[in-house]
Amino acid sequence: VRYFGKEHAEEVMQLYRDYYYAYWEQKSADFPGLERQFIFHDLRYARVFKQIGEGFECFSSNPLKDIIRERVPGRSFRIEGNNQVDSLLSGMERTFDRFDKVAQRCAQLMPQLPEQYRCFFLDNLSAPCHYMAALSHSLYHFLRAYKYTEKRTKNLDLSIEYLEKAQEALYSTQHGVF
């Protein structure tokens, strides 16, 4: 109510919930009752891009390695399944669809919000949601380029296009004093 007005508080609350639930849960929780213990957040995206990018020409179904100082084997990514690439492709496909839907709802709500609430809504929810949608699409196409060499150029072009959209979402939050 405080940040978005009484009229839109419930809808915004649901958008926040759906945004956080859009993240891919790549591994089931280790602790009972600890819902969504493992989510695939943006730092993991960066590590996937980096690690696969470094060995892009030599396909491996399990290309991701633990970060150097990791004390627990397998903890860096915690991806369930025998094939990291297929698990990531499946996870990103579900994830970008969920982020796309929440981003679309954010875009529909934005003009309905009173002017004084729009900047905070953009910076705190709408832009991050658009960013994660685009980043998820980008990683999906990057992984497809890595796995399917016959359509590598097309998928890399799409990956770059979505990275540029992700960058635009970040830039949309660069404005005057909040």
Question: Can you say where each PLM-predicted feature lies in the sequence?
Answer:
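Substrate-binding groove of N-acetylhexosamine-processing glycoside hydrolases
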Residues: V1-F178
